[in-house]
Structures are given as C-alpha cells and as structure tokens.
Design a protein with these regions (language model features):
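Beta-strand-loop-alpha-helix segment that lines the small-molecule cofactor/substrate pocket
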Residues: 1-26, 41
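Predominantly a Rossmann-like dinucleotide-binding segment in NAD(P)-dependent oxidoreductases
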Residues: 25-104
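Short polybasic amphipathic segments
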Residues: 137, 155-171
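A structural alpha-helix within SAM-dependent methyltransferase catalytic domains
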Residues: 9, 13, 35-38, 86, ...
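Contiguous beta-strand/loop segments that form the cofactor/metal-binding neighborhood of enzyme cores
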Residues: 82-156, 187-202
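Glycine- and charged-residue-rich phosphate/anionic-cofactor binding loop of Rossmann-like
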Residues: 174-179, 196-204
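Short, well-ordered coil/turn segments that N-cap beta-strands
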Residues: 15-18, 45, 119-121
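A short glycine-threonine-serine/GTX helix/turn-capping micro-motif
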Residues: 69-75, 175-184
Length: 204
C-alpha cells in the first residue's frame, strides 16, 4: 500500500536522488498515441474503459502465489489496468467496488474484478492468475471505440495493433487498424529515465 512507499520517498529526499515507479506500459508508443488521439476529441467523450489481463500459474513456489510476498492477481497485474486508466484520463478514481475469489490453499486472489468511478467515467477490469492467458483493453467513447490487442505485455520483436471502430455499425464493419513497429517498452522506459537524469528531459 501507499505506506510502503514512504520510506523510499524519505530515503530519496535524504540522499537527493530521483526515483520513479517502473510502469513500462506508459512508455510504449501505442499508449502515447492513444492518449493524443483521445485528447484530440476524435473518440468523443470516454464513457468506459474495460480491461482483462490473465495467466495460468498454479506453482505453489512461485512468488505470485505466496501471500506473504504480495502474491495474487491484484498485486501482480491489477496495477496495469489501473495505471492506464489514470494515465489516459488524467484523473484519480473517486470510488471503487471490487470482488475476488481466493485459492483455498494459496489464500491469494486468483480472480478479481474491479469497477472504478472516475466521475462519470467508469473503468472496469478483471485480472486472473488461474485462467487462460489473455490481455485486452476496450475504450468506449461517444463517437468511436478502441481495442488494444496487446496492451500490457507487448512482444518486443513483433508489431502491435490497435483497432479503431468508427461507430457506424454495431457489427464493427467500419474500422481502422493502427500498427506500431516492434519495440521493447522496457528499453524505452530505461532510456527515458536515463535521459531525464543526464539530459534533464521530461519523463512522463
């Protein structure tokens, strides 16, 4: 929780160093493009963001399944749909409701669903650790909608696609595909932070 971060912040201030949370997704060009696209007004007003992120891991020795080490779906991957919603909307949620199902042996959540209220804009997500491997984000606007095929774990050696549905048909016949070339979002993240330290550039 936020209290766990306080000692790190104090240490950084004391030693006059810079720290940054390592959310690599914010540095992938697809998300930066989407944020600009939303700000342009092309999608209209965002009404909902829906995300799914899941994998299947039942190894009792894996840190993701050990409660005392912060295991479970919410702690492991729930942060990604949360941070993307905050990044795109430039807002903090006013309230949220959540429900989860826990493994009877691990005592960690293996299936969790969350609904966040950003004040007239909803963001909902489901994360799971004992389900089919899957990831997707759907952004619903009053004019158009967007589907991000590989929103969180983008393969560094393969291109990524986002699909923009123009809203002229409920059957999604009228769409545009935006393709981004292969890129390692972790490398981009490290480069951005290094440039911030060495060249005083702005880091988002």
């Amino acid at each position: 929780n936020s209290k766990d971060i306080d000692p790190l912040i104090k240490a950084a201030k004391k030693n006059k160093v810079i720290i940054k949370e390592a959310f690599m997704v914010r540095h992938h060009p697809q998300w930066q493009w989407i944020k600009k696209f939303i700000k342009s007004g092309n999608i209209g007003k965002i009404t909902n963001i829906s995300s799914v992120f899941s994998y299947n891991n039942k190894d009792p020795k894996n840190i993701r399944n050990i409660q005392k080490y912060g295991g479970g779906a919410i702690y492991d991957i729930g942060c990604y749909p949360t941070v993307i919603s905050r990044y795109l909307l430039d807002k903090e949620p006013k309230k949220l409701v959540a429900s989860n199902f826990k493994d009877k042996n691990f005592k960690t959540d293996v299936l969790s669903s969350v609904l966040m209220d950003f004040g007239g804009i909803y963001s909902s997500f489901t994360v799971a650790t004992q389900s089919n491997k899957s990831q997707q984000v759907f952004i619903l606007g009053t004019k158009k909608s967007i589907v991000i095929e590989n929103p969180f774990n983008a393969e560094p050696k393969k291109s990524t696609n986002i699909v923009i549905y123009n809203g002229n048909s409920i059957y999604r016949k009228d769409n545009t595909i935006k393709t981004f070339p292969p890129i390692d979002q972790y490398e981009v993240q490290v480069t951005a932070f290094s440039d911030h330290l060495l060249k005083k550039t702005k880091v988002d």
